[in-house]
Amino acid sequence: MHWSDSYIDIPHEVLDCAQLVERALHEQFGRTDIHFPRRQADDLAHRSALITGHQADFAERIEEPVDGCGVLMLARGRQAHIGLYCLIQGVPYVLHSDALFGSSMRQPLARLPRCYRVEGFYQWL
């Protein structure tokens, strides 16, 4: 069993992408010091502004991902979606909450939907 198993199929209206990451960091990695700003609107521009405006407060880019690090994704060309990197039996996945899908999921990085593109991997500060 992987630590991410218990975070699959949580409704998006219960935990959006940032809330899912925050909860997993608290519960699985003991990072109770991380509290992301809450979104005030569910639109791409607002989510992107939150991420780009606060990214340096929480994480710094790394070249090689490790289990539990942040995954920043571009959504329609904007830095507007985050998840957690999961390495399971040598296969890289991302755990994230997707509004269109309606819940959280763990997807192989190689099979992300076309609406997402990995911008980079980040270690938590």
Where are these regions (language model features)?
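A generic structural signal for short, solvent-exposed coil/turn residues
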Residues: 75-77, 86, 113
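N-terminal capping segments
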Residues: 1-62, 67, 73-76, 80-81, ...
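Short, surface-exposed linear patches
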Residues: 35, 93-96, 115-119
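Residues that flank catalytic or metal-binding motifs in active/ligand-binding sites
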Residues: 67, 90, 117
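Catalytic Cys-His active-site segments of thiol-dependent hydrolases/isopeptidases
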Residues: 82-105
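Short acidic (Asp/Glu) patches
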Residues: 55-56, 103-108
